[in-house]
């Protein structure tokens, strides 16, 4: 497959496995040279939202600086015949490769972290890894969540509250500076965005 960049506004929405590997490798190299005192290091870490951003960086730090066992939970799209996978998918593959090279214990679950099925799988993996986690990183950025107790689906949005947002943006495709306007969120959108990250059951 030949991967070509696809630009939306000023964001490249096409990921490349080699680029993701290099990104994760650079972070791991930095973490390897930042060894923390043994007493300050977690031994077993659960990362909810482990494929990009703060979650991925926290996992890399725990694994390569502290030699911690890590379990990552993420929901990423794999590759298709003529379409590459998401960046998060390649990031996880890169992390697994580097973890194996350094003899680290690293497990992953690709699934909906809000679902009962995924929670049960985390519990089983935790048992296999030796028990409770002494550090939990919560770094989920999901656009929607279905509450397993009643089937209600909540959808998040990124909009201003109580005012119209206006600013300039760069369209790299057309090489133009444009004005962008975003209308304020409705009461329903605000409610859904807040409820998306509210625990749906006492077990959470």
List PLM regions with ranges:
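Glycine-rich phosphate-binding loop and adjoining beta1-alpha1-beta2 segment
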Residues: 75-104
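Class I SAM-dependent methyltransferase Rossmann-like catalytic core
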Residues: 3-32
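Conserved small/polar residues in nucleotide/adenosyl-binding loops
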Residues: 197-204
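Rossmann-fold cofactor-recognition segment
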Residues: 99-115
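Canonical Rossmann dinucleotide-binding motif of NAD(H)/NADP(H)-dependent dehydrogenases/reductases
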Residues: 43-71
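A glycine-rich helix->loop->beta "capping" turn
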Residues: 104, 121-150
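Short, flexible helix-coil linker/hinge segments at the edges of structured domains or between repeats
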Residues: 148-194
């Amino acid at each position: 497959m030949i991967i070509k960049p696809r630009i939306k506004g000023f964001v490249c929405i096409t990921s490349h496995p080699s680029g993701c590997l290099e990104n994760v490798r650079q972070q791991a190299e930095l973490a390897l040279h930042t060894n923390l005192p043994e007493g300050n290091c977690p031994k077993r870490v659960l990362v909810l939202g482990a494929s990009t951003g703060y979650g991925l960086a926290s996992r890399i730090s725990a694994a390569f600086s502290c030699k911690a066992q890590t379990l990552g939970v993420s929901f990423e799209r794999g590759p298709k015949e003529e379409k590459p996978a998401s960046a998060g998918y390649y990031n996880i593959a890169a992390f697994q490769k580097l973890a194996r090279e350094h003899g680290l214990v690293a497990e992953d679950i690709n699934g909906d972290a809000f679902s009962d099925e995924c929670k049960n799988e985390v519990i089983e993996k935790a048992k296999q890894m030796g028990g409770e986690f002494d550090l939990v990183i919560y770094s989920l950025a999901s656009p929607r969540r279905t509450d397993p107790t009643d089937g209600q689906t909540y959808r998040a949005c990124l909009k201003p509250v109580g005012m119209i947002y206006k600013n300039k943006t760069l369209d790299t495709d057309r090489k133009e500076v444009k004005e962008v306007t975003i209308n304020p969120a409705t009461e329903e959108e605000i409610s859904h965005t807040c409820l998306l990250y509210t625990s749906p059951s006492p077990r959470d």
